[in-house]
């Protein structure tokens, strides 16, 4: 069988809607399209290109039925010359055309993926190179040619081996022409390929050998292109240089060569550029400048390596020129190494520390030798060489490049202008820091025990000043200026005396010059000082006291923008001018906020050494974010002023927040963080809460910042003081699935684990909470779903309260999370580990949670006592939530191939297997109430309401109008209900009685409420209720699921048309095959093979009814005009319990028949007489609970016709043609239904039966048109 695919065929500017036929050769169809478009050329030259995919259609996609090669459905296929013919045509034009640019433009218009591959294979590069090497090629022509060569270079079939060296020479010679950007782009492609780089370097070296001065290529690109005003040229040029440095075999030497052309000073003048792409290239060049230092720091010192030995000899010969080198000697200790053998001290920084010491000794020998000439006392020993290695470590961490991934292409690290001053800028910074270190060591009169304090103080000052300086001289002067300011600030803090203490003052040489007595005032404030400036808030807490007097201290904080911050403590006045009648001293201290930074310097030392120290004009932020740093610490009695200064204050605020913490809390952008803060210094620092910047970012920052931190050298396994890891905070927030998955991957990459399972169950060491339970606590359904997607198997980890994830979700009453957890393996039977509470105890028997926890064991009492406002659980919205027991019925008759019915034996010994006994079958013995308009009916009896009424009746009631109900119960529990309605609406109620023979008579009316449509959910079971086997559901079984075979239900119905006076039988799609019955003069096409079908369809005979009545108690039926509802006869089972069910229907002349599993009949049945069809104002509705359409059959209007029993000929209708059509439709439908049953019964003759079924349905459709 052939299939067609709808496509749009395009040729030049024309397009047609056509089909591609599968199974037909593509060449044949292309020939047809060429004829449609009137193409004169040979069709074999043409191909069909799928425009969206950029691929050509092949026979593979045409002939293979299930081919997944390409999807061309509804796509545009362009009819064009095949790739081979296109290339041949273009090459022919390039060879013959004298206009080189025109031929190149033609070539550029064909540069598709397939064309480029074919162009390279056919030697097209030779033609292109010939144009480039041509002397007559203009600059514009070369620009187009270089652009085409750049495009071709990205395809796999391309190799730089195909390109000759003269072409590369032509490319290099055009680097200096600013308007020829393609030459620079082509140079970048060359520099990123090993073969291309070699050819590029050969061309540059060749030019360097033959030219001098400004004609040199490096001079052109450094002094010409980088100094130009075209930002694109600058970016491309610097990109080329960076690529050449990266692929160079000796990058350090290559950079030295570039420095001879003053590239650093040229770039330094361009640092103010704002273009992101250009600034990124500047940052990459800075990384190349410091890569020597980074590489040396990662190269461990090896005393057995000759090159390393020579470096150590260089240091010895510089410091001790008159002595023979010795690897182990006490001179090494004299200059500051820890041991006689210095090799062990280089373990931290490798060769970088050694090279810096060599540079210092060679260029600033006087600084190196001063500690040796002026030897400090043993207590003040200055480990000069060791401090030099520590300074090297600081510089490496300070300037170390950050990791920039493809996801952060716009992220640029910190650019230090001072590094672009000269080639040795970094070495000179090192020398300045060593000088400052010595100054601080002397001023502090430091000992070896506080070495780390001195180092932290110096490194804090350097990290603050370094990004702001443009040259080494400025760097040195600014640091010295800050040191002097701190000395002045300390001196200005001294106040009048209340208590005295003695302190020793040391001179510069460390000797005691004098002993002085200093009088200080104890001033400690408890006043909280809150500030609002650039989004930061800090507080100052302390107590105000003095020894002799009660002092009122007023503090006024003013800023340049006019804002005022005041601190008010106990018994304090906030007025600047205070009159104290009690002669109390009032101290008014004005503090100025300059540039949003607070300086608080009103603290003095007391005899006990409780001091408040404030510092950091930078506000603890390199970026100048305006955060306020006020540090409160307990310091020891100092010998000099500078020792009282807390070292951490220059970088850390009182709450322990580093500048990186402050930037995160102030919601700074990633660009501001990377540009304004040296993140390498603070990545793993913790504040007073134990939060690292990553942990803090996972709590409040956007995903981009978290992603960036995870790609740096941060440790994601440092917990906070509350035990939460960064991943806990990460899971407590909402992310997209892609963000969450990538974040988990980055966390996983930094751990030793290899599965998501270990990260998901990472435990808080304080509360024992996992990230999953943290997400549940915060109600974050998205994160819970993501976690379960990554790790579906949930282990029942218990927290410190004994709860697992499911317990927490239940306590939070989050139905969605509870469902997700159970679906992913959470066990509802596990109790609380400590309190032993079960899940049901935790949910307090909440019905909705109980259904989720245990849908199959929900008790009927819980269901019946639920609120009336609760959602009705029916088959559509709570399938399987309540266990429903069907009424016991005989098994389904089995179908044989000869269309005969064989009834299977029932579980009862008195099974009814003949036609007469089938009249006793309980077809509609118990009618369940159903409300078509979704109303809540609270009835103990089954009521059908189609008029939007809510009924609360405990008897047989008619809800619509004023009806009188007389309930008469006879000894056989048969009640006759006479209902009088003002609208002449009568309800016929037949009580179906089940008689049993076990001598058990019940005087109560038992109700079976097994239908899912029972609105009040009452559930009263019969004492002797046997379930029908699931493989053979009864007719009145309340649920027919999709798994139930069609052949297992037996429901039929009655249908008549306005043109036929006699009702005829029509079967439902689930009825067994019919057998023809010729008992009457006229054949009626109905299922008349059993008394059961006769009973249901109203074709009763006197003999069957008499036999049926003999086996039961008297079943009386009364009928009247108007609307009616009917119940079928009772069945005689082996029980002696009488069950009375009353069905009342009153619908304002609406005839409603409710039968479970069967189509209702549209008239009243008098079991001893004929059948009454409803009055001519009756609307017949059939409500059924079977697998067929749950709705009403079309309404047919009767004519008050009375039918005759079986055997009496039906009166012919007036319109014979329509009547015949009706009969034919019934016959065809019966045949169709029988064929359906045969098809479902087995595979025998299935194709033949399907064919017959199609023919029967087509014939039926033709007859319906005659209606």
From Swiss-Prot:
ANK repeats lie at residues 655-685, 689-718, 767-796, 801-830. SMART domains: ANK. GO terms for cellular component: plasma membrane. InterPro entries: Ankyrin_rpt, Ankyrin_rpt-contain_sf, ELMO_ARM, ELMO_dom, ELMO_domain-containing. Keywords: ANK repeat, Repeat. GO terms for biological process: actin filament organization; cell motility. Transmembrane segments: none annotated. SUPFAM superfamilies: Ankyrin repeat. Residues 307-466 form the ELMO domain. Residues 507-598, 859-870, 895-908, 924-1033, 1108-1176, 1184-1213 have a biased composition (Low complexity). Disulfide bonds: none annotated. Residues 486-496 have a biased composition (Basic and acidic residues). Residues 1057-1080 have a biased composition (Polar residues). Residues 486-598, 854-908, 924-1040, 1057-1082, 1103-1215 are annotated as: Disordered. Pfam families: Ank_2, ELMO_ARM, ELMO_CED12. This is Ankyrin repeat and ELMO domain-containing protein D. It comes from Dictyostelium discoideum. The gene is elmoD.
